Amino acid sequence: SYEVAKTLQDHRVDYLAVAVADEGSELRKAGITSSIIIMNPELTAFKTMFDYKLEPEVYSFNLLNELIKAAEKEGVTNFPIHIKLDTGMHRLGFAPQDMPELIERLKRQTSVIPRSVFSHLVGSDSDQFDAFTRHQIETFEKASEELQAAFPHKILRHICNTAGIQRYPGAQFEMVRLGLGLYGVDPYTNQMLHNVSTLKTTILQIRDVPQEDSVGYSRKGRLNRDSRIAAIPIGYADGLNRRLGNGTAYCMVNGKKAPYVGN
């Protein structure tokens, strides 16, 4: 949102990242001037990215070739892009063995220029994946060094997400990507960060429900005592996962904890 972007810009954050070009263009129209990475660049949105100086993630040769073609058509040169490497997530990204071909393709054109190279950690928030995380970091470091050696300008590197920032300080390189941590969510211990937002609602109705009766879908909320149940007008459509039900989470009502009942 604009409010989050404005706060980050005021604190001189180097880069913002959004999912699609439309989000980036809306921030530009609202006055955000910070550099913006587009993490899911649509093939139909290249013109928008050029016009609003929105820098796309590039994860495949097909996307790279289409972007270069669009840039040449618009007369765009040296447009910054962000190269994604697949070091183990196996969703999007160039494989490390693609690096020689990628470098060759980048060097025989002038439309785009690599501004950063990055990857995504699979399990940085879990001790059980530490060996794999270290393998990812080593793979990334080797491939990114190969890319950097081919170009005279500095190419930024980033692989750490919120948990990675906390647990792998030696892998912070030149940038990090703070996501959940921006909102005070600590995916590792839930102890280091403080929540920065509060979701407030109102109570629509209160009813007394007898012991052994149930509340909610599939009769999941079985009552082991006579209970007073409050209904509130928010749920999974507002981002509350159904798995938070049956006492897993709670609301604060007049300063007292009221656990969720049902799912």
Model-predicted segments: where are they?
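Active-site-proximal beta-alpha core segment in soluble small-molecule metabolic enzymes
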Residues: 1-158
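Active-site anion/phosphate-binding pocket segments in diverse small-molecule metabolic enzymes
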Residues: 5-6, 10, 20-25, 41-44, ...
